[in-house]
Curated annotation (Swiss-Prot):
GO molecular function, one term: carbohydrate derivative binding
Residues annotated as domain SIS: 280-421, 454-596
TM spans (from-to): none
UniProt protein name: Glutamine--fructose-6-phosphate aminotransferase [isomerizing]
Pfam families per UniProt: GATase_6, SIS
Organism: Caulobacter vibrioides (strain ATCC 19089 / CIP 103742 / CB 15)
EC number: 2.6.1.16
Segments forming domain Glutamine amidotransferase type-2: 2-217
Organism taxonomic ancestry: Bacteria, Pseudomonadati, Pseudomonadota, Alphaproteobacteria, Caulobacterales
Function (record text): Catalyzes the first step in hexosamine metabolism, converting fructose-6P into glucosamine-6P using glutamine as a nitrogen source.
A GO CC annotation given for this chain: cytosol
Entry superkingdom: Bacteria
Gene coding for it: glmS
Amino acid sequence: MCGIIGIVGKEPVADRLIESLKRLEYRGYDSAGVAGVVGGKVERRRAQGKIKALEAVLADEPLTATTGIGHTRWATHGAPNVRNAHPHTAGRVTLVHNGIIENFAELKAELAGMGRTFESDTDTEVIAQLIDVALAKGLAPLDAFKATLDRLTGAYALAVLIQGEADLLLGARRGSPLVVGEGQGEMFLGSDALAVGPFTNRVIYLEEGDYVALDHDSRRIFDASGARVERPVRVVPTSSVMLEKGNYRHFMEKEIHDQPEGCQRTIAAYVDTLTSKAAVPGDIDFATLDRIQIVACGTSYIAGVIGKYLIEQLADLPVDVEIASEFRYRTPALRPGSLVVAMSQSGETADTLAALRYCKAKGMKSAVVVNAQESTMAREVDVVWPIHCGPEIGVASTKAFTAQVSVMIALAIAAAKARGTIDAAEEQRLVKVLLEAPRLIAEAIGLEDAIKEIAADVAKARDVLYLGRGPMSALALEGALKLKEISYIHAEGYAAGELKHGPIALVDDQTPIVILAPYDSYFEKSASNMSEVMARGGQVIFITDTEGVKHAPAGAKVVVTAPASDPLVSTLVMSAPIQLLAYHVAVVKGADVDQPRNLAKSVTVE
């Protein structure tokens, strides 16, 4: 959600903090700030808006520190303004933070009861206050830091300065990435290797729960228990630091694991976390629309189909979804009162761009759901809805897909509220459900070891079928697409109700049948399809949730139990198992996971 940089050394750091923050702009942000230890005191410079606004502040008020931290912020708790911009200070402590502290309200109330006052609306300031309280009790900086970490619930990456400690930089991570960079007579902290890439090619990827104390020429790393540990130093060519996989074997694996943070960043851009209301950017009056026309290709098309289910269900607004390469070569019946929504990770997909231009020529208002905000589509539409998931390197889309679906969910809520099909209470409930999705996705990713075992058998198959009902029928298409893209196994996805209309002829004891069935209104019908498949010797891989597993018919070869979720976000939660299955099947088969044959990341030709 945010970008972090920290430097401890012997030379002024302000210019390099800014340089690093510019490299982190791809992550998205609405404010920026830096801080440094000057003459034993910590000084801050902050600005709302782009980094150039922060540079203007620094031009008027230079920062001469040799130890400093920097941050680009996407608002989660608190409005996007200077008061809520990082770094945040409490007493002797100044810090920057990426993540969400789930128990901040409880901690803030406790601190307020101690007479502590707050200058911002953020959850981050609570962390600074807790560290300062511990320091006031006489704890050493590192001990005060650890005592605070033990009290936090949620996700964080932190970089911390302490007043009077000009040669100390503290860092920690849980749920959000953080790296250490080793330089000559200086050390660095960063959100990723890209952040420290201009200054060093020696990078340490902190593991979950690690915290670290840096001075200009040494590092001390501790695990979550407080034990001193060593982590491997990786030499990362600075020319290719953007393409760094960290400790993962493939970009696809990394990007699957990036999804909790990625979706959190996406969702934060489309809802107000303080009021639990939808806050979709752009000038679109959903109340006056008579129809939405979605055009897309590949995985983006499937995300659009999921969007159709949700928008029609919640907002009673008709939605058509078409494959752009088909749409553009027929004569669709279009109306000026409709909205065309193009969906494309790159914003350059040729067929989608052509379909978008066709609709615009018919007088339709236009929007794009896109990752690349400077792309052709983004420049040509009336409204841009960015997905904010950061660079996606693997050809088979994972985090961009779930980010697109996250945007579609937010759009569905906003449209429903605008059209009066839900009231304020239901809007708040739905937004809270959406805000829970990143945590549930992380839990689903935790099924990876079990899915690895399944992959060994699936890798032997010649064909695989995926079945689902409702939005899960779209996810069945996505599961099949992922598997065929990277493992080269023939796979097909079907609406489970179509089973008896043809696909059941393919069922035998050699063909794995993946059935996606969370415990929702479609579950009983999906369970019936499962029984039909098993009666014919089909090898069922049943992907359900903690409620569905209680009601599933016996006989499945394998049952994968994802966390239970509201139907609003079940496609997000169930995406992780199908992505991991495709990934590990491809690994077993020795396929080129990140660059599968014949495929390109951005399809810019017809």
